[in-house]
């Protein structure tokens, strides 16, 4: 039986020999070494180096002769060489007792060093295993050698047993090497994944940098200061990448992962450490808050724009309001002028009616009342006409009382003055539906909400109290807008009412003017038809018929061409006569106007003279009053002086009398004067 048959083909299902290694335990040790927990202990190395370092009691007796197989036994020094080399190779391998702390940039170099150390160990074991595999192959090629079928214990010497152990260990090492190669492939795959993830993160960081630059360029600096206040303060002292933003709150979660994992990566765990859920939640909240800040800033800008629009709207409304007030003032003045014209026309009508009635033979009471009313009106409107109306002179004066024609002329002048004032006014036109006031702009809240719904981005935060306040402010703005519109409508209504009143006042005035013109025309036509013949008592009836013919037109005569020619000749004669009378009346009117102007000038001159005389009289009166007061004052002063002199003289006389009385008593003269007597 050969030595190959005596070697175990498999270690499954049996316990290993005392001097052998368990492949399952070795594979588990290799796995621990792969995960970074491999420890180079002297006991494991002693166990890996085989039974040559164990005691002699653990060795199996070998009965076969080594020299018959052509295999020389190895000396202990030769057997120890591969063990020492393997031990040196394992010591040269950078296996640490703890997890290797490597950074992300030198992962590939660390893996390369580990791989080179493993290759050195495998090469050392392979070199020594080849030296022991040659005697075994010679034994396999010579199965019929003497003593091959002898006793197994005698045929297997110590060298063959060592060779078998090393061959089996070589197989185990090859298995471990395959495992290490698979792990290396997985490590390379994970390294490639890490590199791909790094590239992805770099792209994301570049995109974040671009977006950050856009955000820094578009919003005001206050947003950046707010972002710095919201940024994570714990990472202020940490080392930052050159491409990472300094204080931006928009930092991507992958950046924090890279920062946190750059100093904690190890050989056994190459994937980056994921942040905690609290970090994710905080980052999401920061992103939401930043979006809300941006949306609120946009909302603020929109509100400012709407506020500017409303300011312009208010200014335009104030301008329109001033314009409406000016138009209302103009309408008030126009209404007042219309009322004055109506009053003047009523007085003129009363004068004309009274004059016509007086010509027919009526009483003069109506005429006097009309003249009195006209005088009162002229006195009342004297300031508006800028003309001083001559007042009726008292009895005994040389100024005559104004005639009805003069009063009518003055009233016509006042009407002309009112018309000139009317022409100076600027009456607003009637408002058409096209020029009606347009409704105000849409509310700011609806406008801003519409714009915000169109714009992309995070929605506004759900505000409760602030939203209610905004709604309240919007309601107040709407109420103020409605009140302003109501005021404008009321002013427009008042303007329309004033315009309607002015038109109503103009109607009767125009009717009165038309009646007056018709009356004048009828009067002129009546004077022309009468022809100055007053001896026929039926002249009044003929004048009435002429007036009726004037209103109704010339009668149509039946007949031929002669009737028509006679009618046309009659009408032409009447027209020429009426024109002549009109010219005469105009000349008379002009002469009357000139006389009126002369009388007015005389009246003004006399008024000026009387005013001058009054001023002179006042001056003389004041001078006389002053002289009287001065004389009275002087008289009083003289009286007071005389009274004082009399008092002094009485006192002096009393003193002299007392002295004389005393002297007389002292002398005892019987012929002394009496006390009532005085001596001068």
Curated annotation (Swiss-Prot):
Residues 76-86 have a biased composition (Basic and acidic residues). Keywords: Coiled coil. This is Harmonin-binding protein USHBP1. One of its GO terms (molecular function) is PDZ domain binding. Belongs to the MCC family. Residues 1-15 have a biased composition (Basic residues). Residues 177-219, 362-386, 479-506, 573-661 form a coiled coil. Interacts via its C-terminus with the first PDZ domain of USH1C. The keyword Coiled coil applies. It comes from Rattus norvegicus. Residues 1-101, 135-162, 217-250, 524-562 are annotated as: Disordered. PANTHER family: COLORECTAL MUTANT CANCER PROTEIN MCC PROTEIN -RELATED, HARMONIN-BINDING PROTEIN USHBP1. It comes from the Eukaryota.
């Amino acid at each position: 039986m050969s030595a190959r048959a005596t070697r175990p083909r498999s270690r499954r299902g049996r316990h290993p020999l005392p001097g052998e290694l368990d492949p399952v335990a070795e594979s588990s040790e290799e796995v621990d070494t792969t995960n970074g927990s491999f420890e180079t202990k002297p006991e494991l190395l002693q166990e890996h180096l085989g039974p040559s370092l164990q005691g002699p009691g653990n060795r199996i007796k070998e009965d076969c002769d080594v020299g018959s197989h052509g295999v020389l036994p190895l000396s202990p020094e030769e057997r120890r060489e591969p063990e020492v080399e393997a031990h040196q190779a394992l010591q040269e391998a950078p296996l640490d007792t703890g997890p290797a702390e490597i950074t992300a940039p030198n992962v590939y170099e660390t893996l390369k060093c580990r791989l080179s150390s493993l290759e050195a160990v495998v090469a050392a074991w392979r070199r020594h295993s080849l030296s022991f595999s040659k005697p075994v192959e010679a034994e396999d090629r010579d199965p019929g050698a003497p003593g091959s079928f002898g006793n197994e214990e005698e045929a297997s010497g110590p060298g063959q047993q060592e060779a078998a152990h090393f061959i089996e260990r070589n197989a185990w090492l090859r298995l471990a090497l395959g495992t290490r190669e698979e792990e290396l492939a997985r490590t390379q795959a994970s390294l490639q994944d890490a590199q791909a993830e790094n590239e992805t993160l770099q792209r994301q960081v570049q995109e974040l940098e671009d977006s950050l630059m856009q955000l820094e360029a578009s919003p005001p600096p206050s947003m950046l200061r707010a972002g710095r206040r919201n940024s994570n303060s714990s990472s202020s002292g940490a080392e930052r990448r050159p491409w990472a933003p300094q204080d931006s709150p928009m930092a991507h979660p992958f950046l924090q992962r890279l920062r946190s994992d750059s100093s904690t990566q190890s050989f056994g765990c190459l994937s980056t450490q994921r942040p905690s859920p609290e970090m994710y939640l905080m980052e999401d909240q920061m992103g939401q808050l930043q979006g809300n800040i941006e949306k609120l800033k946009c909302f603020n800008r929109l509100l400012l724009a709407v506020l500017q629009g409303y300011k312009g709207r208010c200014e335009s409304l104030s301008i329109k309001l001033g314009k409406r007030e000016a138009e209302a003032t103009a309408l008030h003045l126009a209404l007042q002028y219309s009322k004055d014209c109506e009053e003047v026309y009523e007085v003129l009508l009363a004068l004309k009616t009274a004059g016509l009635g007086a010509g027919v033979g009526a009483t003069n009471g109506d005429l006097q009342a009309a003249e009195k009313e006209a005088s009162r009106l002229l006195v009342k409107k004297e300031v508006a006409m800028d003309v001083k109306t001559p007042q009726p002179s008292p009895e005994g004066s040389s100024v005559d009382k104004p005639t009805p024609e003069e009063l009518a002329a003055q009233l016509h002048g006042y009407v002309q003055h009112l018309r000139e004032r009317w022409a100076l006014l600027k009456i607003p036109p009637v408002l058409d539906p096209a020029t009606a006031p347009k409704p105000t702009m849409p509310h700011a809240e609806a406008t801003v909400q519409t714009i915000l719904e169109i714009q992309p981005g995070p929605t506004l935060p759900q505000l409760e109290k602030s939203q209610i306040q905004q709604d309240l402010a919007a309601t107040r703005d709407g109420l103020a807008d409605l009140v302003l519109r109501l005021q404008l409508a009321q002013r427009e209504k008042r303007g329309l009412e004033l315009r309607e009143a002015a038109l109503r006042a103009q109607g009767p005035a125009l009717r009165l003017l038309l009646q007056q013109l018709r009356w004048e025309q009828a009067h002129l036509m009546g004077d022309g038809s009468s022809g100055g013949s007053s001896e026929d008592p039926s002249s009044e009836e003929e004048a009435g018929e002429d007036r009726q013919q004037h209103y109704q037109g010339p009668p149509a005569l039946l007949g031929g061409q002669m009737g028509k020619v006679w009618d046309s000749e009659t009408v032409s004669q009447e027209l020429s006569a009426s024109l002549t009378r009109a010219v005469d009346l105009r000349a008379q009117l002009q002469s009357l106007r000139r006389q009126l102007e002369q009388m007015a000038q005389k009246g003004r001159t006399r008024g000026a003279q009387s005013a001058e005389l009054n001023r002179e009289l006042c001056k003389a009166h004041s001078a006389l009053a002053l002289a009287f007061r001065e004389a009275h004052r002087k008289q009083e002063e003289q009286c007071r002086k005389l009274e004082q002199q009399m008092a002094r003289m009485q006192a002096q006389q009393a003193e002299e009398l007392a002295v004389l009385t005393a002297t007389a008593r002292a002398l005892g003269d019987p012929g002394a004067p009496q006390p009532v007597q005085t001596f001068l």
